């Protein structure tokens, strides 16, 4: 059975999306990605959402051929006040994480992506090479907790 939203629930959701902190900055923000340019790669969806203290990233795309390592999947340009709250792991690296690549012929491969911080830009980069003998799809979901 489909849930029908009451007027009160709609107003509550709207108030959450308009939430601001003590400095008047929105705590619900949506940011579109800038896809990287690499032959054999396509980013179909890239979005980042700040929801309170959670900075949530989702990237979906595909590869159509083998690709050497170290290239940009996509970038997110963040407001300066959010970028200042991101703590680096080492050098300019925020994190290095695994994700799955699934080809149309059923082959599953684990690969690594790295998140670099360059000023107020977060760069999601392919850290390892990609073995994509056929159309290979991927989805990255990453949640980063930022301080208040």
Could you describe each region identified by the protein language model?
Residues 1-24:
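Short, low-complexity N-terminal tether/leader segments at secretion or assembly junctions of large
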Residues 10-12, 83, 125:
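Intrinsically disordered, low-complexity regions enriched in polar/acidic and amide residues
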Residues 43, 67-75, 85-148:
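Extracellular jelly-roll beta-sandwich "head" domains, especially the C-terminal globular C1q domain
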Residues 56-60, 125:
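Beta-strand residues in well-ordered beta-sheet regions across diverse protein folds
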């Amino acid at each position: 059975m489909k849930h029908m939203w009451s007027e009160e629930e709609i107003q509550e959701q709207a108030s959450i999306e308009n939430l601001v902190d003590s400095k008047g900055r929105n705590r619900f923000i949506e940011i579109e990605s800038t896809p990287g340019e690499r032959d054999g790669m396509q980013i179909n969806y890239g979005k980042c959402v700040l929801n309170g203290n959670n900075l949530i990233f989702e990237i979906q795309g595909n590869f159509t051929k083998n690709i050497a390592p170290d290239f940009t999947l996509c970038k997110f340009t963040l407001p300066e006040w959010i970028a200042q709250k991101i703590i680096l792991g080492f050098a300019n690296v925020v994190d290095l994480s695994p994700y799955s690549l699934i080809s149309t012929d059923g082959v599953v491969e684990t690969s690594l992506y790295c998140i670099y911080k360059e000023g107020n830009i977060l760069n999601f980069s392919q850290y390892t090479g990609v073995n994509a003998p056929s159309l290979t799809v991927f989805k990255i979901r990453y949640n980063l907790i930022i301080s208040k």
